[in-house]
Amino acid sequence: MHMNIDHARVRRESLRWIIILALNNARPVGAYEGVILSIAQSEYPDATPLELRRELDYLAGRELVKLDKEPGGRWHAALTRTGTDVAEYTVDCEPGIARPAKYW
């Protein structure tokens, strides 16, 4: 049996999980996009600022992340209460985020 893997989708969903984990570790202060990007680039060295912003916007749209788009151009992100619950496995995670299955 041949499986077609959508690599772009896997990458997007994995980046979203990486962002959530990074912001969970940055609580309660949150983090600027540059810090989050450097963390994302440890898994995806070719990750771009635009790609990161697209996924931050997605997570903000799902009300998992609060974004502060500063007038100077920098973005600051922090987890919402729901985002923290997703990171801590206390709520179900809807499709679109590559959260690993809970094993404990």
Question: Where in the sequence are the language-model features?
Answer:
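Short alpha-helical segments that sit at the start of domains
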Residues: 1-30
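Short acidic, hydrophobic short linear motifs in intrinsically disordered regions
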Residues: 29-40
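Alpha-helix C-capping/helix-to-loop hinge sites
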Residues: 22-26, 42-43, 66
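Short amphipathic alpha-helical interaction segments
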Residues: 46-61
